Structure formats: structure tokens, C-alpha cells
Amino acid sequence: MHQYRRFSAPPALLGATLMAALAPASAQVAPAALAECAAIAADNDRLACFDRLSGRPARPAVAPRQDAAAPAPGTGAAAAAAPAAAAAPAGSESMFDKAWGFDPSSSRYGLSPYGANYLLVGRYTNDVNMAVYQPLFDSGLFKPGTTIDSTEAAFQLSFKFRLWTTDDRRWGLWAAYTQQSQWQVYNDSGNASRPFRETNYMPELILSYRPGTQWGDWKWNLATLALNHQSNGRSDVLSRSWNRVIGGVGVENGNFALLGRLWWRIPESSDSDDNPTISDYYGWGDLSAIYKWRDNSFAATIRGNPSTGKGAGQLSWTSAPLLGPLRGYVKLFSGYGETMIDYNWKQTTIGVGVTLNDWL
């Protein structure tokens, strides 16, 4: 009985033999297959083709990534922003919104300008009101030769402080104060000693509201109701004062605004009324317009009493900033009542100086 001994070829020799046998077939197939894979345009399909040639198992198909669809109008992020935008006052560039702190992010108890804060280094009048001071001359208070200059300085301080407001700032209660002085700084005649000719004091309590109503391009952004006292703080024949309830409405269109006011004088007894006819000259209301152009402001105000035909008009120009917050300021006035002491005196005045702010 023959016994056969098993023969085992070395592994390296076996691998070389198999490669030699397969080489001709691979040389014929590979170039054509590679060309076919390279011709595939889609990235995923082309990679799968090369994987098959290399003997790798096919990878599971991955669905192509799709970008999240944009939310439809009125949904998603856009909808979330809508309530916030609706809560904020319309028109962030609104002159009334800035002046009266209607922006919900504004300080609850803010101090801000009210009227213009100005200094007129020169104010000239075409007709000095000497008549009202005649009792002082008659009493001998002034020496002979004392006069009132037609040129003087003038300044005004005006600010307001918010005492109360709602969370959305649409309602507010303000305390305001304005002081205007006429200073005979250039007068050294007789014993005049450069006096303050007149100073007017005007405290107010003001309720403000933002209606937020729009008609075309016009926006109604301000309504006010104020309790106003104005006096010159003097006594006897030079005393002037009155108390009013004032209602105001402000509308705007871009860089142009209108502010209209009507007032009612609170009656006083004849014994205490220093100026019973002041409404005849000062009027029942006023209308102001302001136009802003290239950081300049042009303003006009008219007021009067239709039944008497008396009143006044004022024009002013506020320049662009000259030095820090200081701006050039020119004011032209004509009519009655530039000051309380002159309420029934008609004159035309012009003043030149600087201001810290517009009235709006």
C-alpha cells in the first residue's frame, strides 16, 4: 500500500502564482471600468463605482441633504419678530418720539430739553418800551439820563423731567420749567448798572400721549395737555402773570413737523388780575412748524386772537453744530408779547447767539 505525502507550497509562491494568472484579465478590464467610473457626473454614484472596482461593499445610500425651507410669511422667526416691531413706536427717526421719550427703551425718569436753551449775545428792538417803566422814573428810582438800551442780551433755560410713564412709554407725566431773561448788559447810562430788564418764569405740568396714527405720509405722534403758569415775579405796576390750560397736537412727515396748541385762561378776580387784556394781545393759541435740513433747523411760529387781530410771529434758524453741542442761533420776532412786560407792546426784534438744542 502506497502512502502519498501531502505537498504544501510556500504562501509567497502561491500568491505570486495567482497574481500572474489574474494579471492579463485585470489589464484588459481595469482601464475600461475606470473610464466608465470617471465619466459619472454625480459625486455619490462615481464614488460607489470606484468602491465596486476595489472590492469594497457598497455603502448604504444617504439621502441628499436638503436645506431647511424658508418659513412662510407670518411664521417662524419672522412671526416672532413681528410683535416686538409692533410694540416699538413707528418711525425710529420721529422728532416727537425723540423729544418726548416715546421709545420703550428710553429712561423712565429722564431729564431732557423742553424749549430751546439759548444765549443771544445781541438782541435789538426797533421800539423800546419806555412807557411801562415810566412810574419808576417818576418815583425818582432812576437818575435823570437813565435810559433803556435798544440792544441787550437775552437767554433762555428750558427743560422737562418725566415723573411717571407707562411701560410702553405711550403715556407720560412731566414737570417742565422755562425761564427767559432780558439783560441790559450794555447799558451803563445814569444809574442803570446793567440791570435785568425782565425775567419770565414758566413752570408746567404736562400729560403726554403718543396716538401713533397715520394718514398717508403724515404721522400723528404727539398729544399733550398742560397746566401752565407764567409770571415775571414782580410786584405793583410791573407785575404780570396768568394761568392757562393748554392742549397740543403734533404731526410730522419725515423732517417736517407741525405743532398746534390752543389754550384757555383760568379766570382771576378783577382785584388780583394784573393784565386783564393779555389774551387780546397774546392770543388763544399758536401754530409752529419746523423743518430740518442737513443738520440745520428752520422754525416758524404764529399766534394770535382772531377777534382783535393782534398776535405775533417768530422765525428762527438753528445751525449745524459749531463747537461740541453749541449751534448758531438767529431769532426774528414781530408783534405783541415777546415778554410778559411787553404783552401789549408791539415791536420787531432780532437776536443772534448760540443754542444747545432746538425746541424739537
Regions found by a protein language model. Give the residues of each.
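Long, repeat-rich segments with strong aromatic
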Residues: 285-339, 358
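Bacterial N-terminal signal peptides
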Residues: 10-21
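Outer-membrane pore/translocation modules
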Residues: 131-142, 149-150, 164-291, 302, ...
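Outer-membrane beta-barrel initiation region
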Residues: 59-188, 192-195, 199-203
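N-terminal secretory signal peptides that target proteins for export/translocation
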Residues: 1-7
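N-terminal signal peptide c-region/cleavage motif recognized by signal peptidases
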Residues: 22-26
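Alpha-helical, heptad-rich or low-complexity scaffold/stalk segments
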Residues: 27-63
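Outer-membrane beta-barrel "beta-signal"
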Residues: 330, 347-360
